[in-house]
Amino acid sequence: MKKINLLVALVCLCVGNAFAGSPEIIEKYVTPTRVMWTSDQSGKYVKNADILTEPFSGQVAVNDNHCVVMKSDDSHTASLLIDFGKEMHAGLKIFAGIRPDNKPVSIRVTYGESVTEAMSQIARDGKKNPTNDHAMREFTIQLPWLGSATTGFSGFRFARIDLLDKNVELDLRAVQAIHRFRDYDYLGTFKCDNERLNKIWSTAAYTVQENMQEYIWDGIKRDRLVWLGDLNPEILTICNVFGPQAFDLVHKALDFGSTGYPLPQWQNGMPSYSLWWIINQYDLFMYEGNLPYLKAQLPYIKGLVEQVAQNIDPKTGREKIKGGFLDWPTSPDSVVVHAGMQALCIMTFDAAKNIGTYTGDQALVQRCEQLIKLLRKHRPDHHKNTQASSLYVLSGLSKDAKKDAQNIINNGMDQYSTFYGYYATEALARTGHYQQALDDISKYWGAMLDLGATTFWEDLTYKFVANAGRIDEFVPEGKYDIHADGGDFCYKGLRLSLAHGWASGPAIYLTQNVLGVRPVEPGCKTIKVTPHLGNLNWAEGTFPTPQGIVKIKVTKDANGKAVPQVEAPAGVKVVYE
C-alpha cells in the first residue's frame, strides 16, 4: 500500500511540475466566422459548408446528421477554406459524424496566416516558400468514425481541409480552433479620439499576448524561439500592458538567455542580443523594482560588460565586435551596422551603469562610465540610415540630434522596419517630433491593418503596400501578394511571420508619449507624466504598477496644451514636466 501511495504521489508531482510556471495558459474553442471557399459550388462534392460557422456543443452524437458532406473521386478532391476571424496560436479539433462506413478517413489540413498560405502546399508551391519550419502547418491525418482528431499548434487564421480518400463520404460535423494563450488581464489600456490609433495599440498588445506561451517567443508560427534582442519591445509592451502578473514570465525568458548561453557565449549566438539582454534587465527593473532578482544577475552582467569591453579599441573607442546585427534590412550594410553597434554599446553600458547604481556596485558604475567616455570618442558615419540615426539619438551619440531625427523623417516609410520602427518613433519623440511619430505609426502599422492584419508582422516593406492585395482575401490578378511575393533574408515569401512580437512598438509609444507615463524610480514608485497629444483632442488609459493601477486622462486647455488628470494608488508618486 505504501508503494502504491508513493507511486501516486510521484505521478501527481510529475503532473504538477509539467504545468509549473504556466498556470495562466488556457485553451478556448473558437468557431469559424466564415467559409471562404469550397472546391465545388454544385453541392455534388461539398454540401452545407456553412454549418461549420454555427455554434457546436463539442460533442458528436449518433443521431446528429447536421453535417457538412464532403465527397472525393478520381476527378475531384473535395476541399474547403475556413476563416477564424483573427490570427491566433492554436491547433484544430475536427469532428466527424456518423456514416455507414466506419473506416478512418484521410484528410489534409493546411494552416495559413494568410489566405494564400492556407491555399499553398509545400510540394506544389515551393516558389512561394511555404514551410513546416519550427511548427507544422501542413498535416495529413485520419479522422475516426463518429469522433474527433486534433492537429498541432502554430500561428494561423485560416485553415484548408482536403478530403484525400477517394470514393468515400465524409460527414464533417464541426471544425474548431483550440486557441491557446495566457489569460492575462489588460491592466494597461489606451484610448483616444483616433480609432485607427486605438486599433493599432490593441493589435500590438494582442500580438505580444499571443507570443507569451511557455516562454516569450518571437513569433507563433516561427521561430517560436526566445530571441533576446527581439524581447526588448516585447518586454516593454508587457510592462505597459500586462504589468506585474507577467513579470515571472519575463524573468523566465531573461534567465533562458543567461543560463542557456554562459559566458563567453553570445546570447543566441549574436553579440547585439547579449547587449539587449543587459538593457532588458534595466528596463524590467524600472517597472518591477525587484532588487534581489537584479542583484542575482550581477555576476553575469559584470562578466558580460568586460567581454564587450574587450571588443572596444582602447585608443580610438571604436567597437570591433564581430557579427554585429541591428535588424535584417540593415544587415547588408556593414557601415550602418557598425554605427548602430557603436550606439548600442553606449546604451548597454548606460543601462549597466544604472544597474550598478541601484545595486550599490560602485566599481561597475565607474567601469561603465569609463567605457561610455571611450565609446563617445568614435562617431562613425551612419549613412543617414533610419535605424542607426535612431540609436544615435537614443544613446546620445548624435553630434546633432535634430539632424539625426530629420534623417528619419526624410527617409520616410521606406527605411522603417517593424522591429526598429519603435526606436525610430522614440527618437522622433526625444527630439520633439511627436506628431510626426503619430503620423508614422498610423501610416506604417496602419498599413498592415488596411491589408487585413489582426496581428503585426515580422516585416513590412512599405513600397509594396500601394499595390498589395489583402491577406484575408484571394489576391486579385495584377495585385501584389504581400505575403507570398514579399519578404527577404530569413523571411522570404510565406515563411514570413505575420504575428511577430518585435512589431509591438506602438503599444509602448502611445502609452509612454501620448499618455506620457514612464517610471523614473524602480518599481514605479515614482512615475513621470508628460503627455503629448499632437493633433489628438484627448486620450485616456491605465498604467499597471506593482502598487496598483494608475488612471490617466489627458485633455487640451484653451491654448491647446495637454492637461493630464492622474489617479495613482498609494505608494506611487506622480511628477509632471
Describe these PLM feature segments.
Residues 1-21:
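Bacterial Sec-dependent N-terminal signal peptides
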Residues 21-214, 230, 244-249, 254, ...:
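Extracellular/oxidizing-compartment recognition motifs
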Residues 21-109, 354-379, 433, 520-577:
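Beta-rich accessory regions
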Residues 24, 44-45, 118, 370, ...:
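Non-catalytic C-terminal accessory modules of carbohydrate-active enzymes
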Residues 117, 158, 169-170, 174-203, ...:
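Active-site acid/base region of carbohydrate-active enzymes
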Residues 347, 384-389, 405-406, 415-420:
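Long, ordered, helix-rich scaffold segments
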Residues 401-410:
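Alpha-helical repeat scaffolds
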Residues 412-451:
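Repeat-solenoid scaffold signature
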